[in-house]
Curated annotation (Swiss-Prot):
It catalyses: citrate + L-glutamate + ATP = beta-citrylglutamate + ADP + phosphate + H(+); N-acetyl-L-aspartate + L-glutamate + ATP = N-acetyl-L-aspartyl-L-glutamate + ADP + phosphate + H(+). It is an enzyme of class 6 (ligase). The gene is RIMKLB. Residues 119-304 form the ATP-grasp domain. NCBIfam families: rimK_fam (TIGR00768). Its main location: cytoplasm. The lineage of its organism: Eukaryota, Metazoa, Chordata, Craniata, Vertebrata. GO terms for biological process: glutamine family amino acid metabolic process; protein modification process. It comes from Homo sapiens (Human). GO terms for molecular function: ATP binding; citrate-L-glutamate ligase activity; metal ion binding; N-acetyl-L-aspartate-L-glutamate ligase activity. This is Beta-citrylglutamate synthase B. The keyword Ubl conjugation does not apply.
Length: 386
């Protein structure tokens, strides 16, 4: 029976989004995983938490209950567009200071709260980015009309705190920018970005969990607009992706320090990619349907692997080795760097199969020559099979 008295694994979310598909699916998957592995589990809503510092020590109360056994891993889902450093991030920092392993960590979430902050983190690492300008002050949009002209028109204009494709414009010329300056809300700054014409109305959404690409989806606008977000009526379809594209998504995830993220890549005529955005609170309802994946289940598996349990650690270690062996034995999916991205096939198989299926399939073939090369690994595999 699953207990919440001394929970090892928590799911922490926000009341405003807890009924959304990703949160409900992650809760389902975590409950199932913890019951399967006989792990203690607790679901917590952000506004139930009271933070304490008593006698110089950090403490925690939930709905009046003094917490004495702290979670080892906390899966975090907070609405990044509305994240407040004085409340939400304070709770996450408190848990992290108490020794809890958060996924994602508070700094990783902050790296994605503001689109320009994301680019600041990625700059200097050799990551291909569209040229981008922003500004200080609260109402300096108008002064950027001249400053950003070097980016050439048309240019992309985005609210740095926007989400789901909202508050994104394609400015035709300086007059259009001037009109926008009178229409937009100025609570958050805007960024001005070089337009990648060849990727108009389409991009590639890559979901990365634990430093591994779990799947990729081509998103296309259906009404001619620049944004391809499924929440705005765009359609998503499973696609293959070149090794360059996969490695770029993993690199971005690593630089930003994210355990779970969605990376959006813009496509160029020469088959290369540049980064559009990174999402710490990635949605995956369209992704699950298009790619026939259970992203929540993959997240739950990874969360369990972070617990200090020998069996779980060996299991995910094996999964990593199996995945590497599988990837190196198959031909590269997606267009090579010299081929236009238009050749990406929406009917191709997914980049990475479901981790559980991959593991089960390969375990049935053991012992094989590859695994006999390492006796220690073979012993661990035998433990799992038994």
């Amino acid at each position: 029976m699953c207990s919440s008295v001394a929970a090892k694994l928590w799911f922490l979310t926000d009341r405003r989004i807890r009924e959304d598909y990703p949160q409900k699916e992650i809760l389902r998957a975590l409950k199932a995983k913890c019951c399967e592995e006989e792990l203690d589990f607790r679901a917590v809503v952000m506004d139930e938490v009271v933070l304490t510092i008593e006698q110089g020590n950090l403490g925690l109360r939930i709905n009046g209950e003094l917490i004495t056994a702290y979670p080892q891993v906390v899966v975090v889902r907070v609405p990044t567009p509305w994240v407040q450093s004085d409340s939400d991030i304070t709770v996450l920092r408190h848990l992290e200071k108490m020794g809890c392993r958060l996924m994602n960590r508070p700094q990783a979430i902050l790296n994605c709260v503001n689109k320009f902050w994301t680019f600041q983190e990625l700059a200097g690492h050799g990551v291909p980015l569209p040229d981008t300008f922003s500004y200080g002050g609260h109402e300096n949009f108008a002064k950027m009309i001249d400053e950003a002209e070097v980016l050439e028109f048309p240019m992309v204009v985005k609210n740095t705190r926007g989400h789901r494709g909202k508050a994104v414009f394609l400015a035709r010329d300086k007059h259009h920018l001037a009109d926008l300056s009178h229409l937009i809300r100025h609570e958050a700054p805007y960024l001005f970005q070089k337009y990648v014409k060849e990727s108009h109305g389409r991009d590639v959404r890559v979901i990365v969990v634990g430093g591994r690409v779990v799947g990729t989806m081509l998103r296309c606008s259906t009404d001619g607009r620049m944004q391809s977000n499924c929440s705005l009526g765009g359609v998503g379809m499973m696609c293959s992706l070149s090794e360059q594209g996969k490695q770029l998504a993993i690199q971005v995830s690593n630089i930003l320090g994210m355990d779970v993220c969605g990376i959006d890549l813009l496509m160029k005529d020469d088959g290369s990619f540049c980064v559009c955005e990174a999402n710490a609170n990635v949605g995956f309802i369209a992704f699950d349907k298009a790619c026939n994946l259970d992203v929540a289940g993959i997240i739950a598996d990874y969360a369990a692997s972070l617990l200090p349990s020998g069996r779980l650690t060996r299991r995910m270690s094996l999964l990593s080795v199996v995945s590497t062996a599988s990837e190196t034995s198959e031909p590269e999916l997606g267009p090579p760097a010299s081929t236009a991205v238009d050749n990406m096939s929406a009917s191709s198989s997914s980049v990475d199969s479901d981790p559980e299926s991959t593991e089960r399939e390969l375990l049935t073939k053991l012992p094989g020559g590859l695994f006999n090369m390492n006796q220690l690994l073979a012993n661990e595999i035998k433990l799992l099979v038994d």
